[in-house]
């Protein structure tokens, strides 16, 4: 069947059992998970929020959209429940005999924690069996061999090159080639990345391909090409990036580091992408409590700023009696971010030189003022996490090296209100995780360079199910790259442009 061919209209779940149509559209009450309630009122709140979870009308429309199309994107605000919509469509396709299985590619922790939990939150999805493809290669191969025994197999995006190698030898009618679901397609936006290029080689073997995203074009419309190539198998814009890029963009500099769209190109690309995408508007989303971002600006001591300016202008500086140099302006940008946070890496990540303690003192005061209210702490560098733990004790963390086995209990404890503090790295735990039941405050020791990571990270607590006023605290060192990072997030400057402007100002 073609991507636009309709198989049949989707029967709303509950209707086939005699339930009225409006019940199926407005939502289905989900049973509460078995959680030790304890005496903490936050646990009671989290349990109540889960037990009254419903399927919204826009999710039902999205499920219909997927059911009727073999190549489709769902663009919806962060926290909109895109996974539930995709699984609803899959469940109906399986029930009607059109499909047997879905292969889900998602950020590592999301694949291991969110997708297995999702099917337990909805009665009409409870029959779906989910396996997580992780661990040693032997274990992963054993699970792949048994894919026909379940409806969903989830795998982290970091394992895509390995996965493609394993799938290459399978028969065309293998269940693993029924439905491909890419959760947060921005992880595959790099046209030169190994993951996206590997997946593109076998994209056409999947009968259905669906993409889910809350940030469709995190930096520019060029970010749309590779996901569109995979989901449509090149039918939308082709499979070769460079010719498409040169038709719609021109280089801003002689080296092609930055590109700008030709007049009218952005609108043309957006309209074309809209032919294969369903978009959920913000007004379709359930009402969320207020969101407040509080910036705290710290003035670094004069000696620290003098050392900072030396690194910016000369690419070397002195700290704690040591001379530390940067090999290039781009590397110096990272060094300046470290200095703004309070340290400098010397020979490596295990060799940190003290610069100042203003930011960690700010964090300590914030934690004390919250008087036990749960706080998520976003950190950028490993040394940031070490500093946090030296100041506040052995704070648990979701980072790049966190395994699924380690992450699951931390997420459960947080959502039960049992963790007063939880640190996380936005690149490792900023996508897809549901952390809204455990708290409503977040602290950033420094802004992120990435608008997408910032938006995704905040959406871990600012999403449907959150009932409290959400406050995001951001610490900014005045006159440093912290300000450039914030401006880049707001204005979409490149790292090179931000550094150039910063040099002009100091």
Predicted feature locations:
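Conserved pre-motif I regulatory segment
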Residues: 42-75
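Interdomain linker/hinge connecting the two RecA-like lobes of the SF2 helicase core
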Residues: 70-73, 77, 185, 191-192, ...
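Conserved P-loop NTPase motor "coupling/switch" region that bridges the ATPase
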Residues: 101, 127-130, 148, 179, ...
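Conserved Walker A/P-loop ATP-binding site and its immediately adjacent core
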Residues: 101-121
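Conserved helix/coil segment N-terminal to the catalytic DExD/H
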Residues: 138-149, 158-176
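SF2 helicase motor core recognition
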Residues: 161-164, 219-221, 385-386, 422-446, ...
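Conserved helicase ATPase core of P-loop NTP-dependent helicases/translocases
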Residues: 386, 396-426
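A conserved SF2-helicase RecA2
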Residues: 449-458, 462-506
């Amino acid at each position: 069947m073609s991507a636009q061919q309709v198989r049949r209209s989707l029967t709303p779940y509950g209707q086939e059992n005699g339930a009225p149509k409006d019940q199926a559209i407005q939502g289905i009450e989900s049973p509460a998970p078995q959680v030790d309630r304890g005496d903490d009122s936050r646990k009671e709140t989290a349990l109540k929020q889960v037990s009254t979870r419903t399927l919204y009308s826009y999710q039902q429309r999205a499920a219909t959209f997927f059911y009727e199309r073999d190549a489709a994107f769902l663009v919806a605000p962060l926290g909109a429940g895109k996974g539930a919509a995709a699984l609803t469509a899959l469940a109906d396709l399986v029930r009607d005999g059109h499909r047997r299985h879905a292969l889900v590619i998602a950020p590592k922790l999301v694949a291991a924690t969110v997708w297995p939990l999702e099917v337990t939150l909805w009665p009409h999805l409870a029959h779906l069996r989910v396996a997580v493809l992780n661990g040693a290669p032997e274990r992963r191969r054993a699970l792949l061999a048994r894919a026909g025994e379940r409806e969903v197999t989830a795998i982290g995006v970091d394992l895509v090159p390995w996965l493609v190698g394993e799938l290459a030898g399978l028969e065309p009618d293998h269940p693993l080639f029924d439905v491909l679901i890419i959760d947060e397609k921005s992880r595959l936006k790099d046209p030169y990345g190994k993951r996206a290029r590997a997946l593109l080689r076998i994209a056409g073997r999947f009968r259905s391909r669906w993409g889910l995203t809350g940030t469709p074009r995190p930096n520019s419309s060029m970010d749309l090409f590779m996901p569109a190539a995979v989901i449509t198998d090149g039918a939308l814009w082709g499979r070769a990036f460079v010719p498409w890029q040169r038709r719609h963009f021109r280089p801003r500099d002689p080296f092609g580091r930055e590109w700008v769209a030709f007049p009218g190109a952005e609108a043309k690309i957006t309209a074309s992408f809209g032919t294969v995408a369903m978009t959920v508007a913000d007004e379709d989303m359930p009402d969320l409590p207020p969101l407040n971002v509080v910036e705290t600006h710290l003035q670094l001591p004069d000696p620290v700023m003098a050392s900072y300016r030396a690194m910016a202008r000369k690419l070397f500086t002195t700290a704690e009696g040591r001379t530390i140099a940067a090999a290039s302006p781009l590397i110096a940008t990272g060094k300046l971010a470290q200095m703004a946070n309070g340290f400098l890496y010397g020979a490596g990540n295990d060799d940190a030189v003290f610069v100042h303690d203003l930011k960690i003192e700010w964090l300590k005061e914030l934690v004390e003022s919250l008087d036990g209210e749960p706080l998520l702490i976003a950190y950028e560098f490993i040394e940031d996490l070490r500093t946090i733990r030296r100041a506040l004790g052995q704070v648990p963390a979701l980072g790049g090296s966190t395994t699924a086995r380690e992450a699951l209990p931390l997420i459960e404890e947080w959502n039960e209100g049992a963790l007063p503090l939880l640190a996380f790295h936005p690149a490792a735990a900023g996508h897809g995780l549901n952390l809204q039941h455990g708290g409503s405050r977040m602290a950033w020791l420094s802004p992120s360079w990435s608008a997408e990571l910032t938006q995704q990270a905040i959406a871990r607590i600012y999403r449907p199910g959150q009932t409290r006023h959400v406050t995001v605290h951001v610490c900014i060192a005045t006159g440093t790259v912290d300000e450039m990072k914030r401006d880049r997030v707001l204005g979409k400057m490149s790292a090179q442009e931000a550094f150039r402007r910063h040099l002009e100002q100091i």
